Amino acid sequence: MNKFKIQNLKFKTLVVCALCSMFCLLFFALSLHALTAEEVVRKSQEAFFYQGKDFKSRVMMKLISKGGQERVRELTMLRKNYGSSGGEQKYFMYFYQPADVKDMTFMVYKYPAKDDDRWLFVPAINMVRRIAAQDKSSSFVGSDFTYEDVSGRDIEDDAHEIVKEEKLGANDCFVIKSTPKKADVDYSYKLSWIDKGNFLPLKDEYYDKKGELSRVFNAEEIKDVKGFPTVTKRIMKNLLSGHRTETTFIKTDYNIGIEDSLFSERFLKQPPKKWTE
């Protein structure tokens, strides 16, 4: 084989490699664009609410008034998944402080495609109270988060569309508009900035029935915990009242083997220290 043929072969090889690389990049880009809005939201739910088989964290909630006065809620949050991602879940929360919520517990049985079951144990009156489905949009223990914000909203309850793709800071995001199919919530639609890399929601904007911006959620800090990108600090602001809630997750862990027996009315009243400390 002469020198010209060898050079020609090398050139063809380089061209083929370059074309293969371009094809791979194009395929990756097209695969992202091929995602429907529902698929993006589902991936976001999985990344935000379903990572690991189970989850535990100590949570500090700082409730801050328009004037700057602060109240602190401290609790332990536990969560266990049942079945495939996007399926049933159970949540258990135990409150340490302040005094008016000390020893209070909250439990959720989350179901796909039907209303979740929620219970609240109030130690002051030694009573377990069931949270009605219509109360899912009410304030969670006086914070700017709702009960539904804590455990997630069923994907099928909203109509979703990708309205644009843009950067939020350094992150490439899908911007999803989610419009409730029923008028049983206090907002008309929500815009979500969802990271294209890890699919975590980085920002949510809630618009009220008049179409005015009413609440804003921001993921302020993301850390890797056992290989799971985890939002460890999040803020919800109520633009109408000027109130905001800053939530920090500390001592976070995944796949610790939470027992099924924890999620019972018995342990709502007497939570085991093994899981709450």
PLM features: what roles do these ranges have?
Residues 76-83, 161-167, 220-222:
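Short amphipathic beta-strand and strand-loop transition segments with alternating hydrophobic
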Residues 37-124:
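N-terminal mature ectodomain segment of secretory-pathway/periplasmic proteins
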Residues 33, 65-67, 101, 184, ...:
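Residue-level signal for secondary-structure boundary sites
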Residues 96, 107-109, 117-121, 127-131, ...:
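Gly/Pro-enriched, hydrophobic low-complexity segments
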Residues 86, 101, 112-113, 158, ...:
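Short solvent-exposed loop/turn micro-motifs enriched in small/polar/acidic residues
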Residues 152-158, 165:
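Surface-exposed beta-loop interaction hotspot
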Residues 266-276:
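Short, low-complexity, Pro/Ser/Thr/Gly-rich segments in the mature regions of secreted, periplasmic
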Residues 1-31:
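Short, basic, low-complexity termini and linkers enriched in Ser/Thr/Gly/Pro
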